[in-house]
UniProtKB/Swiss-Prot annotation:
This protein's domain notes: The cysteine framework is VI/VII (C-C-CC-C-C).
Name of the featured protein: Conotoxin Cal6.30
UniProtKB keywords: Disulfide bond, Knottin, Neurotoxin, Secreted, Signal, Toxin
Function of the molecule: Probable neurotoxin.
UniProt note on tissues of expression: Expressed by the venom duct.
Compartment(s) where it occurs, according to its Swiss-Prot or TrEMBL record: Secreted
Disulphides: C31-C47, C38-C51, C46-C55
The organism of origin for this protein: Californiconus californicus
GO molecular function: toxin activity
This protein's GO CC annotations: extracellular region
């Protein structure tokens, strides 16, 4: 039973990781929430943490 739980948890973590990285392209990531790319403009690093919050907070 413990093995099944561990395996299920591992698959869940890997799946979440794949979804999180789905929009990455050559180190650049598109943030759907903020509608901008990060990794191109140094002042628009909006994808670390909550990208929408940081874009709004930084006034970008």
């Amino acid at each position: 039973m413990k093995v099944t739980c561990v395996l299920t948890l591992a698959v869940l973590i890997l799946t979440i990781g794949q979804i999180a990285n789905a929009d990455s392209t050559l180190g650049q990531r598109y943030c759907k929430a903020s509608g901008s790319w990060c990794g191109i403009h140094k002042h628009r690093e909006c994808c670390s943490g909550n990208c929408f919050f940081w874009c709004v907070y930084n006034g970008k």
